Amino acid sequence: MDTITDIQVLKDTHKINGPEDLINKLPSIVGFKPSNESIVIVNTDIFSDYIIGCKVISTLDLFDLLEHVNDISNDVGTILCYYTNQKLDKIRPSAERLFDYLNNSINVRDVLYIRNNRWGSFICFDEKCCPTRGRVIE
C-alpha cells in the first residue's frame, strides 16, 4: 500500500461539500484508493471546507496515528477517515478515545468510517444526518 509519510500539502485546494463528497474525492486527491485498515488524515482550512493537506496511514493502530497528528496546528481543521473491514463495534471505542484525546489540542471536525461501500460518523449521533447503519457511498 502506498503511504504518505508526512502531511502532503496540496498544490491546489479542493472544495468539499460534506462528508460523502470528501470520501468520493479522496482517491483522486491522494493518488490511489485507500484500502482496508488505513486512515486518511485530512487537513482543512479551519474556517472553510477547503482541503489543504492529506496523509494516509496504513494501520488502525491508535499509537501510530497519534505520532502522525502531534504536529497538526490549531489553525487547521482535521477530519479522520477510517477505511476498515472490521465490525464497527471493534473500532468505535478507539475512534471515540482518539477524538476525545485529539479534540483537546486540535480542531477535529469529524471522525468518519468507510466500510462495505458505506460511510458514517463516529461522533455524529443524529440519525437523520448519520444513520447508525451508515449511508451508501454513491
Language-model regions: role of each:
Residues 2-30, 35, 48-49, 54-60, ...:
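Charged, compositionally biased boundary regions
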Residues 38-42:
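Short beta-strand scaffold segments in enzyme catalytic cores
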